[in-house]
């Protein structure tokens, strides 16, 4: 059974008088332990698909299940609790809280768990260590480079050990070197820690690091999933 | 829960709007505390005036000393009553008193007159009223036109210094002493010998008779016995109850005014808080989106922003307390509507009042923050993140 099951999903938005159909019967499986890149032009529904998997948005019709949980049928309150346990989300613009240090930002998801203060400290240190920012724990976001901010955001996404990591254009605002660092980190998380990763990207080089590339156009998968070069190697 | 440090630091990051909102709340709290300190001071002055150990006799039906009248026969009956305490010199601790209001010009503007209480007392009055003591000079000598001036009058009325001569009731009165009475309303009175005042003012009649109870716990029995005495028609009050009653009307009005005026001002401060919080929330929508994405529930976002608004209000409340504290002890005067006499008293800023001010600030903060916080909690994550 796939980790993420998307079955016959329709999603439409109303913009003024006009109805925009993003998905019209999308069906897709994402396996546990996979590293999938979602590609496609702007407006093809990549980010919407990510939001549906994370339970940030609901399909107009159809079902989304993640690890057996009926995401598309949960209430907002159930979704919040479910997301805290199962989803690690990374945004294009990092979205760290500017008034909190790197440490405090990474700790945020753990405040929703029953872990003790000591356990939280250990987990945060480990996450910052994995992303190579153990020495930046007390820095505020404004004191970090773009690449460091994004790695902090990734530490925040992995700290609670979620079922799936969802990344929306994680290298969109980074220079080439920082992009490489982030992508290498994601590969490592997938291969060493068996994290299931789904990234949305415009960047073909970024997508090459994934094991699987899916192309979306106007809400449809226009070609069968293909195995990326990195995975083939 | 969303850590409070997030809110505290967010508040500190926008110092101008925080300061302005806090100042708005602070001013309201200062006025709130100031007005209640006024009411508090007035009540306290009158409450301290009466003693639980004393009983006060008025003509039946009289609700103030002004409207009362008791003959010498009544004074004699009471002096002989077994409920009256006896002094070591074997004299009953009774003070039949003359109570009149005299218009005196104020020190800064003698065309402005205030009704000052002139109380003619017996020699025992100084023992019956244990809170009264001479601070300077000698007590009025029996048989002489001497007066002792309450210390609160000294600064406020001319010719009240020791050795000076006050003129009222068509006669001159020599000031021989000043007295204190633990901040009570007696400090706004002029005392002299009752026998001296009687012929000058209202003839052979006392306005009240106050006596020390032999057993303060036996007040009810004393009251029943004296009120049931067929030889006189009197009402007997416990002195403390009488003065508390005297403060009730004006005290209630001052308290009501405090609430009314500060409520109107509070509306302005609440709108200030609403404005600040709406601005904060609209500029931090992506942060709220992140918190909701991480799994914080909408109600925790609501609580977090309510706490932020309350935090700003608490800063305002502390400022308000600091603004209001210097009022403590400032002496002011007003006419007591129950006796039509001038009474001077101090603003009393008590710890309880400061706590009430802070609580009021928090209430303003929570009310002002509620709708913005509700908007934050209801943000659609996808829209908030855009």
Please place each PLM-identified region on the residue numbering.
Chain A
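ABC family nucleotide-binding domain
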Residues: 2-218
């Amino acid at each position: 059974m796939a980790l993420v099951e998307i079955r016959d999903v329709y999603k439409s938005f109303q913009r003024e008088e006009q109805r925009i159909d993003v998905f019209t019967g999308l069906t897709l499986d994402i396996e546990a332990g996979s590293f999938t890149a979602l590609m496609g032009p702007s407006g093809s529904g990549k980010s919407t698909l990510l939001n549906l998997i994370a339970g940030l948005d609901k399909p107009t019709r159809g079902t989304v299940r993640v690890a057996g949980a009926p995401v598309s049928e949960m209430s907002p309150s159930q979704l919040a609790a479910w997301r805290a346990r199962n989803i690690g989300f990374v945004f294009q613009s990092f979205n760290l809280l500017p008034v909190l240090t790197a440490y405090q930002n990474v700790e945020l998801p753990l405040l929703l768990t029953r872990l003790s203060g000591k356990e939280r400290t250990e987990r945060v240190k480990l996450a910052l260590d994995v992303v190579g920012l153990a020495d930046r724990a007390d820095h505020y976001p404004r004191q970090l480079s773009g690449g460091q901010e994004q790695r902090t955001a990734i530490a925040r996404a992995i700290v609670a050990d979620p079922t799936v990591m969802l990344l929306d254009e994680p290298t969109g605002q980074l220079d080439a070197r920082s992009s490489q660092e982030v992508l290498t980190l994601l590969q490592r998380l997938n291969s060493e820690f068996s994290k299931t990763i789904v990234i949305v990207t415009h960047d073909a080089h970024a997508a090459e690091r994934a094991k699987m590339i899916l192309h979306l156009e106007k809400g449809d998968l226009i070609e069968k999933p293909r195995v990326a070069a990195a995975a083939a190697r | 829960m969303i850590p409070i440090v997030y809110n505290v630091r967010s508040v500190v990051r926008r110092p101008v709007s925080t300061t302005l909102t806090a100042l708005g709340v602070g001013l309201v709290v200062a006025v709130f505390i100031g007005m209640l300190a006024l009411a508090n001071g007035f009540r306290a002055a009158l409450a301290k005036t009466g003693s639980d150990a004393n009983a006060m006799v008025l003509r039946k039906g009289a609700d103030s000393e002004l409207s009362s009248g008791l003959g010498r026969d009544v004074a004699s009956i009471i002096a002989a009553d077994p409920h009256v305490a006896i002094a070591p010199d074997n004299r009953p601790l009774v003070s039949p008193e003359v109570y009149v209001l005299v218009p005196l010009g104020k020190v800064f503007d003698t065309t402005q007159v205030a009704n000052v209480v002139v109380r003619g007392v017996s020699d025992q009055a100084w023992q019956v009223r244990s809170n009264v003591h001479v601070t300077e000079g000698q007590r009025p000598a029996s048989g002489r036109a001497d007066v002792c001036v309450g210390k609160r009058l000294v600064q406020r009325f001319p010719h009240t210094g020791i050795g000076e001569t006050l003129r009222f009731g068509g006669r001159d009165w020599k000031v021989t002493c000043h007295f204190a009475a633990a901040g009570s309303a007696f400090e706004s009175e002029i005392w002299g010998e009752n026998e001296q005042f009687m012929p000058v003012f209202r003839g052979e009649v006392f306005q009240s008779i106050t006596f020390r109870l032999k057993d303060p716990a036996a007040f009810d029995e004393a009251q029943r016995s004296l009120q049931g005495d067929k030889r006189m028609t009197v009402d007997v009050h416990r002195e403390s109850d009488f003065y508390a009653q005297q403060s009730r009307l004006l005290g209630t009005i001052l308290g009501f005014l405090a609430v009314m005026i500060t409520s109107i001002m509070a509306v302005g401060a609440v709108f200030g808080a609403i404005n600040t919080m709406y601005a904060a929330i609209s500029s931090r929508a992506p942060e709220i989106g992140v918190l909701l994405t991480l799994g914080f529930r909408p109600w925790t976002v609501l609580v977090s922003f309510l706490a932020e608004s309350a935090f700003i209000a608490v800063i305002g409340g502390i400022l308000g307390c600091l603004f209001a504290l210097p009022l403590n002890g400032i002496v002011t005067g007003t006419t007591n509507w129950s006796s039509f006499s001038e009474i001077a008293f101090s603003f009393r800023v008590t710890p309880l009042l400061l706590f009430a001010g802070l609580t009021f600030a928090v209430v303003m903060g929570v009310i002002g923050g509620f709708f913005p916080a509700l908007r934050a909690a209801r943000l659609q994550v996808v829209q908030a993140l855009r």
